[in-house]
Design a protein with these regions (language model features):
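C-terminal "post-core" interaction segments
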Residues: 1, 5-134
Length: 134
């Protein structure tokens, strides 16, 4: 990747920052209730091959909106203003994001305080760490 050396962010050259990133194993949870940036963030995570996604498919909702208040201040609308285009020219909007490991949380387990997505993610990450340490 190209590095632009004359960019300074908060007193650091932009190219200095990637060497300070987290580079240990990681995993990300996603669920069917994710919306907007909660669709964009796991998409980038998967696209950059940072780690696995665990949970349920995320509907394609990655579009930025401008929040507009009408004359009646109780009426507020999000007007889509920015679409996020992929390298192939398609948009993230209406593009469902599938997890690497599909796990649903059922109402029966949630009311007991159990999170099967979190448990699956932790188990998978521990397996990855264990296999790296062999």
């Amino acid at each position: 990747q190209m590095c632009i050396r004359d960019r300074v962010v908060r007193g650091r050259e932009a190219c200095d920052m990637p060497s300070r990133r987290w580079n240990k194993p990681s995993i990300m949870l996603q669920c069917e209730a994710n919306y907007s940036n909660a669709h964009g963030t796991p998409w980038v995570y998967k696209h950059q091959k940072i780690g696995k996604l665990v949970g349920m498919p995320v509907p394609g909702t990655m579009t930025s909106v401008s929040w507009e208040t009408l004359q009646d201040p109780s009426l507020v609308f999000g007007i889509p203003i920015i679409g996020y285009r992929l390298p192939d020219g398609s948009y993230l909007e209406n593009s469902q994001l599938e997890p690497d490991i599909k796990v649903a949380n059922s109402p029966e387990t949630v009311v007991k305080g159990e999170d099967m997505q979190l448990k699956t993610a932790v188990d998978e990450l521990l397996k990855e760490i264990d296999s790296q340490n062999r």
